[in-house]
From Swiss-Prot:
Family, as annotated: Belongs to the UPF0288 family.
Species classification: Archaea, Methanobacteriati, Methanobacteriota, Methanomada group, Methanococci
Origin: domain of life: Archaea
NCBIfam families: methan_mark_3 (TIGR03268)
HAMAP family in UniProt: UPF0288
Protein name: UPF0288 protein MJ1412
Amino acid sequence: MAKVIVNGKEKVGETLREVIKDEYYNEGANIVIIKGVKREAEKIPKKFLIKTTKGNITIAITENNETAKFFINNYKDFVKKLRWVSGMDVAFGSTTIDLEISTEPKEFKKWDVVLSISGLDKDEGHIVFIKKKTEGVYGLKDPKIGIVVGGKWVIDRLEVGDKIIDIEPIREEKEAVDYLVTTDLDLKLEDGWRIFTYFTAEFDGTPSAVEHCLALMEDGIFEITENTNTYVADCRLQTLKIEEGNLIDRERGFITVRNYGVGEGKVYIYRESRSSSLSHTVVGRVKEGIELIDFSDSGVLSVKXVPERLCAIGLTIEEAEEMFKKYNIEVEKEGDLENAIVVEQEPEYTLDVLKEKKVKIRGLDKNKIIVIELFEDKAPITAWYFRKTTGLTTKRVGKLHVYFKHKDIVMFKGNPEYAKGLLPENIPTDKVEPCSIGVTNMVSRYKGMIGVRLGESDKFGPTGESFEKTNIVGGIVENAEYLKNVKTGDDVYVLLKK
């Protein structure tokens, strides 16, 4: 029997399965085991965090020269005021640089970091950030020490009056640890191992952005779909629109959501500190189990979200009341209350519900909710579009707005912004089956329109378009007859078949 530490608690057992049986863990998720120290951590730092009055800048030491060695040994001497700023570079100083002076001109690229001696006076030493490709005399034989790897936007904002507040080395420690990432629960244990089965994510920030993360992690899973030395990211909700806010420095363990640009909607967890970014909304931080983040490069991780998500949509009225009761939330009910599913909630976001301590929910008879299936394998792009348009990306029940109805076709409003990349896929060939759900693809000027055809057709798809302009995204499996009575302007609620 081996004595080990599991999530901070002492346990005794022969296999991993024995010692984690009472621990929070999702089957198939990564487990990180720290066996011990493999070798000493790198004593000479390769990265430095430079804290300024405008934000943080991270530099990587890329050169192995006397200038770089001087900076590594004397980095605290460069905690100085901004000395000059131009379109070419920005410098902080001055301090003494006791190195051999040179008048040889050197070429530098944008984001190079160099040390400079002004006027060939060793007491006029500076650290300089290059903003544009340049050539000049910087007073040293080998001025370059490294490159900027984080906080480039900070450099562009620096002005007279700013200063460096502190400089800290960032030490690389991952290689110094003898560790194992496994999903094998029958693994034989050894004395002294430290075992981590989950991490805790604590959220507090912009309510809509926090809700995005709570929805992503609602099933207790964080899926690593992107991995770098700086962060891991879960991309499952990529392309969803995110509200900006909470633009603070991204410290180690912080959780952010990208709020615009390529990768909008991705959720990041940071292994290393980075300066704030206009494209990242900070929403929380890892409180326990960051070892899972440090050592997992792929796979899924078990996560406990604090607070848990308080979204009643898709629950029965009784289930919703029970959930809110745990938090002493006052519940106001409206709509159908018997045999009903919650389809609306106000406030919508968990943090707002906890703040206001009351919530209004609206129920709808189960027979009035359209149960559907989506052809995720045959039409993945269209299925994702349908989820985003209806809200099924983050909610259990989605909503469609009736645009018009004609005979056996019901048309719903689409989302033009999301419809831009709707390539043809799963196009009908011979006929369209009754209760098929279709989306007009980009072959048509009306791309993104969503329709249901209640009857069969061998000529036109569910949106009234010809087959080559129609993507079949799914079908209705229950309560299709309810659509016979809807009219223009109605909202129709849809539920994915389990």
